[in-house]
A protein has these predicted regions:
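A beta-strand edge to alpha-helix "cap/lid" segment located at domain peripheries
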Residues: 52-127
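A solvent-exposed, acidic/Ser-Thr-rich amphipathic alpha-helical stretch
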Residues: 23, 29-74
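Short non-domain terminal segments
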Residues: 10, 19, 32, 94-96, ...
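Alpha-helix C-capping/helix-to-loop hinge sites
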Residues: 15, 35, 89-90
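Short, low-complexity N-terminal intrinsically disordered segments enriched in polar/charged residues
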Residues: 1-30, 125-127
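Soluble or luminal CAZymes and related metallo-dependent hydrolases
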Residues: 4, 8, 50, 96
Length: 127
C-alpha cells in the first residue's frame, strides 16, 4: 500500500489481499455507504455483512481458482483515498486477471464510504 494511505485503508487492502473477508468487514463502519460497479452490474450494500457478501462474490467463486491478489499503489485526493488490488486466477474459460480500484473515506476510524470500480476479467496468456 502507498505511504499516503491511512491505517484503516491499508488494513482494508491487506484484508482483501489475504482474502480475509471477516477482517475486511470488521473495518467497515456500521453505517457504511457502499456502491460498486463491475462491467455488468451496479452493486449496493446496506451494512458490513452485505459488503462482505459482495467481496466474497468477487473473490471466492467456487468455480475459480484465485492464484494471487496483490495490492497496487494508491493515492490521496483531498479526504478520499484511492487503493487497489489486482487479481489473477483460473476459471472455466482459462486464466484471467482483473483490477479493482477502491475510493475510501474514513468515519470514526473505520471505512465509512466506499466506492469500488472493477476492470472486468481479462484473459491471460492466449486464453
Amino acid at each position: 500500500m502507498s505511504t499516503t494511505s491511512s491505517t484503516v485503508t491499508s488494513a482494508f487492502v491487506d484484508a482483501i489481499v489475504a482474502r480475509d473477508f471477516a477482517g475486511a468487514r470488521g473495518l467497515l463502519h456500521p453505517e457504511i455507504d457502499f456502491r460498486a460497479m463491475t462491467p455488468k452490474r451496479i452493486w449496493e450494500a446496506d451494512g458490513p455483512a452485505e459488503v462482505e457478501e459482495v467481496l466474497r462474490t468477487w473473490l471466492a467463486d467456487p468455480d475459480e481458482d484465485i492464484a494471487a491478489v496483490e495490492a497496487v499503489d494508491g493515492a490521496t485526493v483531498a479526504d478520499t483515498e484511492r487503493a487497489g488490488w489486482r487479481v489473477r486466477g483460473t476459471g472455466p474459460d482459462g486464466a484471467f486477471t482483473f483490477e479493482q480500484q477502491a475510493f475510501v473515506r474514513e468515519r470514526d476510524g473505520q471505512v465509512g464510504w466506499l466506492r469500488i470500480m472493477c476492470s472486468g476479467k481479462r484473459p491471460l496468456g492466449g486464453a
